[in-house]
């Protein structure tokens, strides 16, 4: 917790303490993200020559590689190039600006198949087009299967044996699945705004106030995420974050879960419900937001399991880490369980 913020924004780590420090995002090339939506088509496109459009449907989906541009900026530019509304451009998730990212965008272009190659050539002057697919519907958040990461950490400090042990632990056990601090705004500013919301304004059926309503949803989401992190922190502290406890809803193979608070609170029961409500009741300013909303309570896995986890020391202080995460999980959260990370992109201007 910073001196200027009332909000805890750094939560307990699985090993009790971090093993060292590291610099993150020294350059965009040190943080590579590859979105996987249609693996077979992505592999076929990578192995072939010029990009051809496959499939049928009203939406042209383009797999683009971008550096130094955030997702929403690219979506707006694509709408202008394609001559469609911004609303008609879809994507599966927001990707960092300060990175090299490969992700899919969908453009609503019914009956314009003959012009696809011309548009792709124009788009390709801005961002390399890696694959193209015609599809029956717009891409939406969370449609993708996974995100692959290749991250280079520089100026790594800490005892090598402790760092190696921590890497082994991440590979075998995973990391606490905290929401990343970017969701909460600078020094928790989104949470400060959340406690000032009139909960009735979050009811979508009572009218929409444009940008103001959109901001309220952002702040509401920040509150929900912070309460989840608080419950997860309690589970990490008592070393039960990898266990399914009595009173948790049926996990359906998801392992232990925590609450995404909603109308009625939590889906847990018994002792687990008592634990979760106790944590949330300690934050009455946020808890009241959920008393008059129609958001259903949900669950989120407590553990982020990085798949295909591997690492390589490029020199004595430079570490390359590669892994795959499910949608909604954060690479910086996984690495932050082991390292105190200094994000050098924060010192650069945002678009």
Curated annotation (Swiss-Prot):
Per the record, what are the reactions this protein catalyses?
Answer: uridine(13) in tRNA = pseudouridine(13) in tRNA
- Enzyme group, top EC level? isomerase
Output the Gene3D superfamilies linked to this UniProt entry.
Answer: TruD, catalytic domain
- One cellular component term from this protein's GO annotations in UniProt: cytosol
The text of the family note is:
Belongs to the pseudouridine synthase TruD family.
For the region Disordered, what residue ranges are annotated? 244-268
Q: Which domain of life is it from?
A: Bacteria
Under Pfam families, the record lists:
TruD (PF01142)
The molecular function terms in GO held by this entry are: RNA binding; tRNA pseudouridine(13) synthase activity
> Which keywords describe this protein according to UniProt?
Isomerase, tRNA processing
Active site: residue positions: 96
What this protein is reported to do is described as:
Responsible for synthesis of pseudouridine from uracil-13 in transfer RNAs.
Q: Does the keyword tRNA processing apply?
A: yes
User: What is the name attached to this protein's record?
Assistant: tRNA pseudouridine synthase D
Where does the signal sequence lie? none
For this protein, what is the EC number?
5.4.99.27
Q: What are the TRUD domain coordinates in residue numbering?
A: 174-304
Classification via InterPro entries: PsdUridine_synth_cat_dom_sf (IPR020103), PsdUridine_synth_TruD (IPR001656), PsdUridine_synth_TruD_CS (IPR020119), PsdUridine_synth_TruD_insert (IPR011760), TruD_catalytic (IPR042214), TruD_pseudoU_synthase (IPR050170)
Gene Ontology BP, a term: tRNA pseudouridine synthesis
